[in-house]
């Protein structure tokens, strides 16, 4: 049985349990900005690096490569306002890594408004299915945008795919229309929460139940799987801390009876 565990205590945690065993864990951080779409201002262009440094309202300017495949965008000038997306968050002395190749994530697809390429997830391996999804993507996009079909698209009805593409495209249109009058720098689109990202990734794979200590999660996850709200310490009930500690040990025991030794 696959259980999605959502703990909203002092240190939030989202876990995927397979038959009670912790298989994957996420630690949501307040202020996560990866995937956010921003309006920034070009502060400096470095021709030798074919890159620009962009003020996005953070402590450090973001780093923006200026030559990106399939976008067809020209070089900006110092002082220009540019729509960018955070690909990697700022870390240490480095500012955020930015892109102008915006991608908007849905359950079944990624929409790329700066590209016209139609792609399919590498996890879908059957040639016939890949070809059919590409044809469906082209019919939906009509050269207006690019699409990357996710694994959840494999068995989705065409009308549902078309509806999600239209929703994502309208989201992009809202961003594009807001940019000319927005303050620089500013946020044009907030990133998905960690919970939203996990739900998007695991919904097509199947979730048997959701267990949480936060009633608000039950509302967000309604219709995905049966939800159980337990107002007690889920980390204790499901022995999460001991499982995390065990997973970090040098010697890990495998279900087959063997051991895996991990040395740094």
Feature locations, PLM:
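DE-rich acidic low-complexity regions and acidic surface loops
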Residues: 1-264
